[in-house]
Amino acid sequence: DLWKKTKLEKQLKFMIENNFEISHTSYEILKKNQKNKKILKAKTFKNFKELLPSCDIGLSTVMLKKKLISKNCQFPNLKTKEDFVLWLMILKKNIKIGGLDRNLTTWRKLNDSLSASIFQKLKDGFTLYNKYMKFNIFKSLLYLFILSINSLKKK
């Protein structure tokens, strides 16, 4: 992942001016051998229900106050979706995630990365909803289906 030179400065200023404890920025996805870049725009999330259907927060775009990470609020032991779980846990504490709609990060997507493993994504997606959000099997499968559809729309 690549940051623009002014990312930290602009994002910190955004957080201070808007009183956010955590924020993320827009980012572009750069795929190997592809000329067109896709930009995912950042938006502010006010509660965890807004983020449940699709993780639109790029890990390398996030800036947060250290105090948000605690024994009960940290990355879980998953191969994928660990960042998604953390953002949902933070939102469940009624902490808004600010969205700075400025493209300050480039994410290079590689075909052989963990992010590309469909089976692992499905497994971890189900675990996210069932174990960490404590949804029953049917609700977990429903949200996993919605997450999968939204993921396909991003491609």
In which residue ranges do the predicted regions lie?
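Hydrophobic/aromatic residue at the end of a short beta strand that borders the catalytic acidic motif
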Residues: 2-7, 29, 64, 82, ...
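Non-catalytic, C-terminal membrane-associated alpha-helical segments of glycosyltransferases
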Residues: 97, 111-155
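Glycosyltransferase donor-binding loop in the core domain
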Residues: 3, 15, 79
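Paired acidic/hydrophobic, glycine-rich loop segments that form the ligand-binding mouth/hinge
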Residues: 3, 23, 98-99
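Short, solvent-exposed loop/turn segments at secondary-structure junctions
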Residues: 1, 29-30, 69, 105
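Active-site phosphate/pyrophosphate-handling residues
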Residues: 9, 13, 85, 127
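Conserved donor NDP-sugar-binding/catalytic core segment of glycosyltransferases
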Residues: 6-38
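Conserved nucleotide-sugar donor-binding catalytic segment
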Residues: 41-120
